[in-house]
């Protein structure tokens, strides 16, 4: 028995006590013999305590008030609540000339601080002291900006930090909360209809008038007249000019039967036509261009005129201008044109030619003119007069 104990519980020799000791494994013996393993529950590391589940159901309120039906989880809470209905206030203030009664002892404790002036609760933001914790919590809303008490009237919606302030504010309202809610709903409905109507695009006054064909508006491409080429328009203009000046001995600017050739008539006729001016005019549109005030070379002149000039009416020069030139003729300058024989149009006698060009002109000198051939062109000098 003793040998078995020594084997189970060995001790080192005195000489080996001074040597470094080897710490054996918990489950190993000195000779390498393994002991039965220990239960893991004995040396397992401690587990952290679990926090209570937030979704856990609160304790059932088994104690209900017989007067108002309010439930409580503890009997003591129910007994304190019943004092509200019975009017029992067992806690009385012993301060002289006070005698106030309270249902709870905590309420009496807070009341006594009114007499003593004690304010143990202090604000950590501004350092203001308070006698109770509820007053300090109400004061903290000033710094945090929380206003939990809201006016129930829909047309007001003001918020307050204290319930008493909200109650005092509600006394100024007239009517019920339901009436205020209905009035607010009607106002919101009218505002939504007005916003939707203003968001719709409306036609401007210019768009409404444009349907009547205003002369100052730009017509659509379907209403515009087809534009002709510049060469065709100029050819038509030249033809009209030749037609106006035909069979007349007066130039175009002195004739009274051609009212359309004047600039004023041209300007007025351009705006009185049915073609409306556009931002992209196609030459002159359907109206003819303004005619040139110079006499045309195609005009047929009489035998006693020199290109229709009133100053050369006495010259007996038969002008061949009654024959149209090939460049401006209707045939377009074809090869069938034949120039007239000069013998039939001009006199062959040189003296007659000189008389035709100069004799008539000598009689047309202006009085006081210094041109050659004038009778008063030569004036004697002063020294010649003395010599004479």
From Swiss-Prot:
Residues 1-58, 191-350, 363-388 are annotated as: Disordered. Gene3D superfamilies: Classic Zinc Finger. Residues 191-200, 318-347 have a biased composition (Low complexity). Disruption phenotype: Leads to a slower growth rate and a significantly reduced sporulation. Also significantly reduces virulence on chestnut stems and red Fuji apples. The keyword Transcription regulation applies. SUPFAM superfamilies: beta-beta-alpha zinc fingers (SSF57667). Keywords: Metal-binding, Nucleus, Repeat, Transcription, Transcription regulation, Virulence, Zinc, Zinc-finger. A zinc finger (C2H2-type) spans 63-85, 91-115, 121-143, 149-173. It is found in: Nucleus. InterPro entries: Znf_C2H2_sf, Znf_C2H2_type. GO terms for cellular component: chromatin; nucleus; transcription regulator complex. Induction: Methylation at position A1935 within the 3'UTR of ZAP1 mRNA is regulated by both the MTA1 methyltransferase and zhe ALKBH demethylase, and controls its stability and subsequent translation. This is C2H2-type transcription factor ZAP1. It comes from Cryphonectria parasitica (strain ATCC 38755 / EP155). The lineage of its organism: Eukaryota, Fungi, Dikarya, Ascomycota, Pezizomycotina. The gene is ZAP1.
């Amino acid at each position: 028995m003793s040998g078995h104990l020594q084997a189970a519980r060995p001790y080192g020799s005195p000489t080996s006590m001074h040597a470094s000791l080897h710490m054996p494994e918990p489950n190993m013996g000195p000779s390498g013999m393994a002991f039965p393993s220990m239960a893991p529950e004995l040396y397992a590391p401690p587990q952290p305590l679990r926090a209570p589940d937030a979704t856990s159901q609160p304790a059932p309120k088994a104690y209900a008030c017989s007067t108002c039906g309010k439930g409580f989880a503890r009997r003591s809470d129910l007994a304190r609540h019943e004092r509200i209905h019975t009017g029992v206030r067992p806690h009385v203030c012993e301060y002289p000339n006070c005698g106030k009664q309270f249902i709870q002892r905590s309420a009496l404790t807070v009341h006594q601080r009114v007499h003593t002036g004690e304010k143990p609760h202090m604000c950590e933001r501004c350092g203001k002291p308070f006698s109770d914790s509820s007053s300090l919590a109400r004061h903290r809303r000033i710094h945090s900006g929380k206003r939990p008490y809201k006016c129930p009237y829909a047309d007001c919606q003001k918020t307050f930090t204290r319930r008493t302030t909200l109650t005092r504010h509600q006394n100024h309202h007239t009517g019920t909360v339901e009436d205020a809610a209905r009035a607010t709903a009607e106002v919101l409905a009218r505002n939504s209809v007005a916003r939707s109507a203003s968001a719709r695009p409306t036609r401007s006054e210019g768009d409404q008038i444009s349907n009547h064909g205003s002369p100052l508006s730009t017509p659509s491409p379907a209403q515009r007249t087809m534009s002709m080429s510049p060469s065709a328009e100029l050819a038509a203009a030249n033809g009209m000019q030749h037609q106006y000046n035909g069979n007349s001995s007066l130039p175009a600017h002195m004739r009274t039967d051609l009212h359309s050739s004047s600039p004023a008539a041209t300007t007025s006729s351009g705006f009185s036509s049915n073609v409306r001016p556009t931002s992209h005019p196609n030459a002159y549109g359907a109206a003819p261009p303004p005619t040139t005030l110079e006499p045309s070379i195609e005009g047929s002149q009489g035998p006693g005129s020199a290109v229709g000039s009133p100053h050369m009416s006495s010259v007996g020069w038969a002008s061949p201008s009654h024959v149209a030139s090939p460049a401006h003729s209707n045939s377009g300058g074809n090869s069938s044109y034949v120039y007239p024989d000069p013998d039939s149009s001009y006199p062959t006698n040189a003296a007659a030619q000189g008389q035709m060009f100069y004799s008539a002109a000598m009689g047309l000198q202006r009085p006081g003119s210094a041109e050659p051939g004038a009778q008063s062109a030569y004036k004697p000098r002063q020294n010649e007069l003395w010599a004479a």
